[in-house]
Amino acid sequence: MSTPDGHTTACHIEACLADLGTDRFAQTFVSFVETLGVDQIMVFAIEHAQARCLLSWHFSRSVMAGKLAETYLDGWFLKDPLLPDLVVSPPQSVTLSRLAEIEGRMSADYRKLFFENPGMLAKTTLLAVGERLRLFDSLYQSDPAAPLCDPDLARLAGRLALLHFEKASDTDLPPPLAALSERERSVCLGILSGRKAEAIAADLDVAPSTVITYRKRAYAKLGIASRAGLFAICGK
């Protein structure tokens, strides 16, 4: 991926600022993050020893994420080597951390599970703390030839995510689904409600095979591999 010019970057940032707190932000934001040359972004809110997924988006065609979000939410976030730093970070701060800085602080099991097995070679994490939220905004890269994402733009991405999620009102829509297309979102909501492909197809007036296509597209974008992964990132 080529590096965007200053004008293009400014346009992306302006669009993100305009959409803060709205249901349009997620799509605008992932368009900006894609220009950073990363394969995946995940945003988790850590609250009272619990983790909640606010955004999971996969840009690469390669299979990288799989069950990682599901596994991370199932207690492994408590072993994140950056968790102690996030807990003590002051309000209105965004701190950048690279994988090389924390490798010595993670257990062998954690390293194997989240980095070696999925082939993640680089991770840039923004520890973003506001008035009520403490976020891990993680940017993953798997291409050994790719440069690390720009630190200033990465910090800005962390700041934008924090501003948005602090401002956004609670809705019935699980936050990770906000960046999907309307049809992809509808299919995921149908799955979350326990409906089968035939019933979802009837609701949308499409063929069941079309529902399966939308489901596959949604799962690929969300960086998940199964229904269980969808339930995990949506907190169901």
Would you name each region that the model predicts?
Residues 4, 8-19, 27-131, 138-144, ...:
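Regulatory input/activation interfaces that engage signals or partners
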Residues 145-163:
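Amphipathic alpha-helical "output/dimerization" segments
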Residues 146-149, 180, 222:
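Alpha-helical hairpin
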Residues 166-186:
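Regulatory hinge/linker segments at domain boundaries
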Residues 175-178, 189, 220, 232:
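Pre-signature/interface helix of ABC/ABC-like ATPase nucleotide-binding domains
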Residues 184-191, 230:
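Short alpha-helical "packing" element that flanks the helix-turn-helix/winged-helix DNA-binding module
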Residues 191-195, 234:
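Short helix-to-turn junction characteristic of helix-turn-helix DNA-binding domains
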Residues 194-229:
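Recognition helix of helix-turn-helix DNA-binding domains
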